[in-house]
Amino acid sequence: MSNYKMPENFLWGSASAAYQVEGAYLEDGKGITNWDKFVRIKGKTFKNTTGDIAVDHYHRFKEDVRLMAEMGLKTYRFSIAWARIIPDGNGEVNEKGLKFYEELIDECLKYNIEPMVTIFHWDLPQALVDEYGGFENRKIVDDFVRYATILFKCFGSKVKYWITLNEQNIFTSLGWLTAMHPPGKFDDVKTFYQVNHHAFIAHAKTVLEFKKLVPNGKMELALLIAQVILLIVIQLMQCQKWILMI
C-alpha cells in the first residue's frame, strides 16, 4: 500500500447542495421551496436557522470556485435548485436561473474543474407540494423529467457527470418516517414506499431522456449507504415513539 498512487484521472473534489449554500432564496425569480417553508416551523432546525442567505454562494460563486482551484480540486458537485429553473415546478422557465448555473459551470471549466450536477438535492418547489403533494403523487414523474430535460438541453454540452436524486433513501426516510425533513411526517410507512416508487420511476425515465440528449455523459442515482446513519435513525424513531407514548 505504501507504493500505491491514485490514478491521474481520479476526480478529487468537493460537493454542495443548492439550499445549503446558495442563499438568495427569493432573488431573480426563484420560487419558494419545501425547505424554505419547513425551516420556518419553530424547532425544526438548530436555533431556527434558515438557508435564506447561507454562505451566499449565489453571489460569491466565482470566489468559491477560485478557492477550489487553489486547493487543487478537480471536480465540483453541486445541485441545481428546481425552483430557480421553474419557479412553480411545472410552468414557465426562469431564464435568470439558467443564466446563474451556466455562469457557475463556465467558471468551473475556466479553472479546469469538472462540473458534476445533481438534479435534485431535496429542495422541491413548494407549488408542487401544494398542487398535488409532491413526490407523494405520480404526477411528480412527468414534471421531474421535464425539468431534467431542460437542464440536459441547456448544459449537456458542458456537463458530463450527472446525478438524478441525491440520497433518495435519506430524504424519504427523514421526510416520512422521522419527521426531520419536509414534509415532516412521522411513521407514514405506506406513503414512504409510495414516494420511493415515484422517485425510482422519475430516475428511470430521466435516464432514458439523458441517453438521448447527452449520449456521451454519465449518470447515476446517489444513495447513502452507512450503517451508523441507519442506527441513528432507528434510535431517533424509538425516541420519538417513546415521547409520543408519554
Residues of each region from the PLM?
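Non-catalytic scaffold segments within catalytic domains of secreted glycoside hydrolases
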Residues: 1-65, 69-74, 85-246
